[in-house]
């Protein structure tokens, strides 16, 4: 049997695919799976009981994870004048205005998150076809359209992330690294869940957290009992 086959078999022996687990149990399963040679990302996939076709049921927001994501973000800021100087001083990786807009129009997207001052949004809005599908478009709802670029950059460095439901009503979010302590992973997931529950549209009917799966980059997807999460 190949090393890959042995690893898959080892994963399959750690849990029951048909069973739902508590969040703590699910994290333990990920921790017990055969290791790989890099620090895997812990992702969650949440199916929400919404109709994304309705404008009042489109979920998008942000949350500050108590322990960060473990990822070093490449932050881009669209700003000019004093705000650009503030962004540079605050440690943004890329700062500019029309020059960055033109660069991105040419296909460059080598960054993880974009921030913009309100006065830049007329030009930044022209990048919708490039930034939108990559979930990189600054938005007021996510807190990435702001006059306080220093505060926003600091929050992003500390672990503020954006979440958004796709056309199927699913949110996919990276919340931690597998090397984090189990308690840290759990607290990050709980913070995300609390934010999702808070963002529930008033018009959404029936079960809201329909399905919740937690996984690692090379590990299994473990189903979590949503009753525990709704109670957060």
Swiss-Prot record:
Gene Ontology cellular-component annotations: large ribosomal subunit
Keywords, comma-separated and alphabetical: Repressor, Ribonucleoprotein, Ribosomal protein, RNA-binding, rRNA-binding, Translation regulation, tRNA-binding
Pfam family, one: Ribosomal_L1
GO BP terms: regulation of translation; translation
Residues of the signal peptide: none
CDD domains, A to Z: Ribosomal_L1
GO molecular-function terms, A-Z: rRNA binding; structural constituent of ribosome; tRNA binding
Gene3D superfamilies per UniProt: 3.30.190.20, 3.40.50.790
Annotated InterPro entries: Ribosom_uL1_bac-type, Ribosomal_uL1, Ribosomal_uL1-like, Ribosomal_uL1/biogenesis, Ribosomal_uL1_3-a/b-sand, Ribosomal_uL1_CS
Assembly mode: Part of the 50S ribosomal subunit.
Alphabetical list of PANTHER family matching this protein: 54S RIBOSOMAL PROTEIN L1, MITOCHONDRIAL, LARGE RIBOSOMAL SUBUNIT PROTEIN UL1M
Protein family (similarity comment): Belongs to the universal ribosomal protein uL1 family.
Function comment: Binds directly to 23S rRNA. The L1 stalk is quite mobile in the ribosome, and is involved in E site tRNA release. Protein L1 is also a translational repressor protein, it controls the translation of the L11 operon by binding to its mRNA.
Protein name stated in the entry: Large ribosomal subunit protein uL1
Organism: Chlamydia trachomatis serovar L2 (strain ATCC VR-902B / DSM 19102 / 434/Bu)
High-level lineage: Bacteria, Pseudomonadati, Chlamydiota, Chlamydiia, Chlamydiales
Gene that this sequence comes from: rplA
């Amino acid at each position: 049997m190949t090393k890959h086959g042995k690893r898959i078999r080892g994963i399959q022996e750690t849990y029951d695919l048909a069973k739902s687990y508590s969040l703590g149990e699910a994290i333990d399963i990920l921790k017990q799976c055969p290791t790989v040679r890099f620090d895997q990302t812990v992702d969650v996939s949440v199916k929400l009981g919404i109709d994304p076709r309705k404008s009042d049921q489109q979920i998008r927001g942000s949350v500050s994870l108590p322990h960060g994501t473990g990822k070093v973000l490449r932050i881009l800021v669209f700003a000019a004048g004093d705000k650009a100087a503030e962004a540079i001083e605050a440690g943004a990786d890329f700062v500019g205005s029309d020059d960055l807009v033109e660069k991105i129009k040419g296909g460059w997207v080598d960054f993880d998150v974009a921030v913009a001052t309100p006065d830049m949004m007329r030009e930044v809005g022209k990048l919708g076809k490039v930034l939108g599908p990559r979930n990189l478009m600054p938005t007021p709802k996510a807190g990435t359209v702001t006059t306080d670029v220093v505060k926003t950059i600091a929050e992003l460095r500390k672990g503020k992330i954006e979440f958004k439901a796709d056309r199927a009503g699913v949110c996919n979010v990276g919340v931690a690294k597998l090397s984090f302590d189990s308690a840290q992973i759990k607290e990050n997931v709980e913070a995300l869940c609390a934010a999702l529950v808070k963002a529930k549209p008033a018009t959404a009917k029936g079960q809201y957290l329909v399905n919740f799966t937690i996984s690692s980059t090379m590990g299994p997807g473990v189903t979590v009992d949503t009753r525990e999460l709704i109670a957060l």
